[in-house]
From Swiss-Prot:
Subcellular localization: Secreted
Family from the record: Belongs to the peptidase S8 family.
Protein's UniProt name: Subtilisin-like protease SBT1.4
Annotated Gene3D superfamilies: 2.60.40.2310, 3.50.30.30, Peptidase S8 propeptide/proteinase inhibitor I9, Peptidase S8/S53 domain
Pfam families xref list: fn3_6 (PF17766), Inhibitor_I9 (PF05922), PA (PF02225), Peptidase_S8 (PF00082)
Amino acid sequence: MAKLSLSSIFFVFPLLLCFFSPSSSSSDGLESYIVHVQRSHKPSLFSSHNNWHVSLLRSLPSSPQPATLLYSYSRAVHGFSARLSPIQTAALRRHPSVISVIPDQAREIHTTHTPAFLGFSQNSGLWSNSNYGEDVIVGVLDTGIWPEHPSFSDSGLGPIPSTWKGECEIGPDFPASSCNRKLIGARAFYRGYLTQRNGTKKHAAKESRSPRDTEGHGTHTASTAAGSVVANASLYQYARGTATGMASKARIAAYKICWTGGCYDSDILAAMDQAVADGVHVISLSVGASGSAPEYHTDSIAIGAFGATRHGIVVSCSAGNSGPNPETATNIAPWILTVGASTVDREFAANAITGDGKVFTGTSLYAGESLPDSQLSLVYSGDCGSRLCYPGKLNSSLVEGKIVLCDRGGNARVEKGSAVKLAGGAGMILANTAESGEELTADSHLVPATMVGAKAGDQIRDYIKTSDSPTAKISFLGTLIGPSPPSPRVAAFSSRGPNHLTPVILKPDVIAPGVNILAGWTGMVGPTDLDIDPRRVQFNIISGTSMSCPHVSGLAALLRKAHPDWSPAAIKSALVTTAYDVENSGEPIEDLATGKSSNSFIHGAGHVDPNKALNPGLVYDIEVKEYVAFLCAVGYEFPGILVFLQDPTLYDACETSKLRTAGDLNYPSFSVVFASTGEVVKYKRVVKNVGSNVDAVYEVGVKSPANVEIDVSPSKLAFSKEKSVLEYEVTFKSVVLGGGVGSVPGHEFGSIEWTDGEHVVKSPVAVQWGQGSVQSF
């Protein structure tokens, strides 16, 4: 990677309002930027960084509209966000105290049974050993929260932890009583959003400038991570049971950062900065970039997460929903816990039965009046005006009273059903295309509908094409729990590696339940989030890495309680090295996009195993100074690296903790890139014994990827009271025979395991040949 000096570094920041005009817009020539400044440059005459930032703006060249300060930052990051003219932006970039200036950008928002699926027990394991995460504070950065929801009841909880420094922002629709001993804090961050959206009233009817959740996403993620126990939870009797968050005794702090128009960097950073000041222990962020992950120094989430990690906060993020293409994972900085999505052993079965007697397995959450048991006429949407079933595009005369086969893609799945209903259709079969494969995602449709896989879709299209009078019916079977189909499996939508920024860091880290997850919902919109949906529900079932992230955030809270002395890196290590990569059938985890075995670029280390993570045996710990050394190893130089460091003295770590290569970062997984067929790559690792036996002896086991030889030295680690931390080195040798790099697959996979007879500490190994090559897998 090229050296990243000051001249090539741009940056991202946000925090406190000084002067703000919601009517300002891009028509005034101003744009929103995030500005990072050197903390140590603040003149002593200013009593606060906020005052200094105001002074900086006042010193800029004049423009028809004055520069407007949005936020000032001082905890997770240092700098401010502001509305600036082009001349003012250029002047700031030349200022000796400014490290970087980058445009404010928008990000996107990417359970009754999952605790049982994860193996939780009330009498043993992680729940009992952490007392359900009692008094750990989880900061949820999302669309806000619906405070009246029973998942946020504080029954049985003690006083608010004395370490909490936050507050509950009140408003016309968010009284002080909205917060309690469960929901201990709530704030809203909208200045960046309002300036970008021109302060219009376009979304005013639905939006609330308070922490109240008008969309549902934030309530869902918060209740998944740390919701209280709620009996008899369901969505129209689907998934009926007792709902509980992963850490049901943890406290929740809600930070509303997402609005109808997106989630803006300036607001995200303001919330992260505030969460650090408020005293959260875990940050859960189901938000990320659309498309490829930005470079670390222009990624506001990566920068804010670095600052949070410096304060000992675990930052758990969604990997994104851009699968199944490779190199789509976002939130991939090594100090972030990156989570992909998987299925659980619960189905909401709704089969499509065609007139020729064939039965196609499907899924649905439809809860209205069922179709008649008799067969109805069946048509393909592509023959009726709109293959993707866009609203208003279907020919009513061709679909009225019939079941319509619609193709997935282009618009929301529930919107397709709405389009069929508005055109007079009786029902819908929604067919996956090749991109989504056999992934089945249940939806609370407004019309009798089911989703089927790509193979079934192809067969039903052929049936329609070849039959003189095609017919079908839909049979709704409700909630089914069992071993068939096997689970977990990786969702087709789950974003994947390799890590396109730093290929030697394996991403995602793990996968967790993210398909058809039941959790709390807002009272503002229906389960489809469509304007025409009049229904209101307490719980909803939705899918995404947005759902898998809070599962892991909750697990991090439990581990934080069970092991209060563990660092964020140690908590990540415990989750990674105890993850599993087989289904409940004993076969390798399947990728639903292809129907083939998944791999470490798709599922990371594998599926989280909470109870094993409680006692991992060994952990790979990483201090902040080692992350600094990593940044230097990938090409960052002073003063540009100050975007992350804030404190110039930390730059010394580039020498005192120098890494031979970025791959030497003490990560709990291995990712190797061979540039040539005979290349040798060496990585060092350091492990700490956290088991009960201080004299444990671990021996190594290696599963080498094809075309690779692996040597681990030493092959035995003998710990003692005096030696609780030991080092080893791994040598990876490419042994490709003839033909060069092009003669082998672009990637292979294996593992390195350390075991003492009680613990198995497993690290995945991913190998690529030809740096920068993109493969399909």
